[in-house]
Amino acid sequence: MNLKEFIIPAIDLMEGKAVRLYKGDFNKVKVYSERPWELAKNFSDLGFKRLHVVDLEGAEGGKPKNLEVIRKIRENFEGEVEVGGGIRSYEVAKALFDEGIDFVVIGTLAYKNKEEFLKILENFPNRVILAIDSKQGKVAIGGWKEETAVSPEEFAKEYENYPIWGYLYTVIERDGSLEGVDVEPYKEIKKHVKKPVIASGGVSSLEDIKKLYGIVEGVVVGKAIYEGRITLEDLQNF
């Protein structure tokens, strides 16, 4: 596997712009682009195979707010596109698939309304990624604002035998922080599941990516690319 397949660049959307939050805090926002679809085109031209898109306002408010921009991103990226944030119903998931999105990333709905979540899995098998967002060792939902008593391992195992594609596992305390990756949570969850796991949160350097390589099947990288911590030269020389 080459790094362009392992790394999944992230575009987080707010008010139609590409932004990054610091540790999931909606008050700590940095804008990186007013035209996110141009970022998507750049990532496509560079040969990345998958793009991770998050509708932050959707995650916070419960339904996607940046559909027009997501549509443009889809048009400008040749590989696979996965979208998360505010997918709390079958209708919203279907609307995204109808736009040509390859995978949807869902966490809150899987926790709060299993019946509705299973309806999506039934109609779109192997196209749903279960979002496991971990805060101090417990799953957080609702745009990371609501904490549960469930461990990431318990949440993952609940759906391991259903037709999900795999898992997106985010360590919230590190997300957008450039503090580096803790590989232990990923090693732990891999003991419990066989489906692919994508890591997310805290990647700050090529070293972090090397640490994760061989443990998980992919890694979402956002801020480290936008802040120049990981350069294209790094990727080509890996």
Swiss-Prot record:
Compartments in which it is found: Cytoplasm
EC number: 5.3.1.16
Gene Ontology cellular component terms for the protein in this record: cytoplasm
UniProt record, GO biological process: L-histidine biosynthetic process
Cited SUPFAM superfamilies: Ribulose-phoshate binding barrel
Family: Belongs to the HisA/HisF family.
Name this protein carries in UniProt: 1-(5-phosphoribosyl)-5-[(5-phosphoribosylamino)methylideneamino] imidazole-4-carboxamide isomerase
Taxonomic lineage: Bacteria, Pseudomonadati, Aquificota, Aquificia, Aquificales
